[in-house]
Amino acid sequence: MTLKIAIAGAGGRMGRQLIQAVHSAEGVELGAAFERKGSSLVGTDAGELAGIGHLGVAVSDDLESQKDKFDLLIDFTRPEGTLEHIAFCVANNKKMVIGTTGFDENGKTAIKAASDKIAIVFASNFSVGVNLVFKLLEKAAKVMGDYCDIEVIEAHHRHKVDAPSGTALSMGEHIAKTLGRDLKTHGVFCREGITGERKRDEIGFSTIRASDVVGEHTVWFADIGERVEISHKASSRMTFANGAVRAGKWLENKANGLFDMTDVLDLNNL
């Protein structure tokens, strides 16, 4: 049976890429596309919006009216909107792939609670390469982490509204967990003025926002006399869109539970 997918935030940069990814993938079809209430894009054909021609799926601002047209919702929007969509999906037994970043602890708790009822893949980054980098960071941290300074440097386009990026935070969390540290107490997100000498157990973060950078992340493991850098650079949002569709297909036979791309890609068995 073909998996029917809906896209939230269909008119955004990521939403349009997701429409393209669904259209080009095997075993899935676009069932619905959504925009915020009152958007000028409501009624527009989703395929024409994404530049791939007429698909016969009109953008809607009402999930309830479209609920019989999709099995799974892919959501890369804003935390407040995603939380509303989660409530709808729980009430209507719809699976979710969530790529929204910037959730506070209450938001993360809501996602975990929802996963008791429905199947969710929630990840800060859906790139296969980035998720492989997570595993490489764990290995590097295990070998070098207690003997070097660790810094996470990330760059994104000028329109990104949260900092550091969800991916950068995930990188820090993978490193911290490997080293038995708590990122909340060991993460350093701002340095200015007289900061004093750097502590060995800090995990530092630096953020760049400029132009149209899709996404770049580099982690330094810096020791005296040498430095190891692990980097990932994305040149197109399609890498994230294709990963999200892959995650959706992986969820097809899952009834409930909270998963991430480590599960989708089976990286724990590397």
From Swiss-Prot:
Pathway: Amino-acid biosynthesis; L-lysine biosynthesis via DAP pathway; (S)-tetrahydrodipicolinate from L-aspartate: step 4/4. NAD(+) binds at G9, A10, G11, G12, R13, M14, E35, G99, T100, T101, A123, S124, N125, F126. It catalyses: (S)-2,3,4,5-tetrahydrodipicolinate + NAD(+) + H2O = (2S,4S)-4-hydroxy-2,3,4,5-tetrahydrodipicolinate + NADH + H(+); (S)-2,3,4,5-tetrahydrodipicolinate + NADP(+) + H2O = (2S,4S)-4-hydroxy-2,3,4,5-tetrahydrodipicolinate + NADPH + H(+). Pfam families: DapB_C, DapB_N. Keywords: Amino-acid biosynthesis, Cytoplasm, Diaminopimelate biosynthesis, Lysine biosynthesis, NAD, NADP, Oxidoreductase. Gene3D superfamilies: Dihydrodipicolinate Reductase, domain 2 (3.30.360.10), NAD(P)-binding Rossmann-like Domain (3.40.50.720). It comes from the Bacteria. Catalyzes the conversion of 4-hydroxy-tetrahydrodipicolinate (HTPA) to tetrahydrodipicolinate. HAMAP family: DapB. This is 4-hydroxy-tetrahydrodipicolinate reductase. It comes from Haemophilus influenzae (strain PittGG). The lineage of its organism: Bacteria, Pseudomonadati, Pseudomonadota, Gammaproteobacteria, Pasteurellales.
